[in-house]
């Protein structure tokens, strides 16, 4: 499923590299890579800090997308298998 979304986003890469969906997708890939790294290296605090920063950036982009276009937000959440944002 992730590979399929990667392929579809790669095809659109030339014209949409700066789109919110592509940015969230690339942050999600980085998050998954860092998570697997931290499972092996639990005390790598610099990587933990980097992971928290990327999580914050992705969360801000998802908040922006949910406010601007709820349908695109729901589709992206479903494609990338991410939990929805907590509402206050």
From Swiss-Prot:
GO terms under cellular component: chloroplast; ribonucleoprotein complex; ribosome
Matching CDD domains: Ribosomal_S15p_S13e (cd00353)
Subcellular location: Plastid, Chloroplast
Assembly description: Part of the 30S ribosomal subunit.
GN (gene name): rps15
Native species: Aethionema cordifolium (Lebanon stonecress)
Family: Belongs to the universal ribosomal protein uS15 family.
Keywords noted in UniProt: Chloroplast, Plastid, Ribonucleoprotein, Ribosomal protein
Protein name: Small ribosomal subunit protein uS15c
GO biological process assignments: translation
Molecular-function GO term, any one: structural constituent of ribosome
SUPFAM superfamilies hit by this protein: S15/NS1 RNA-binding domain
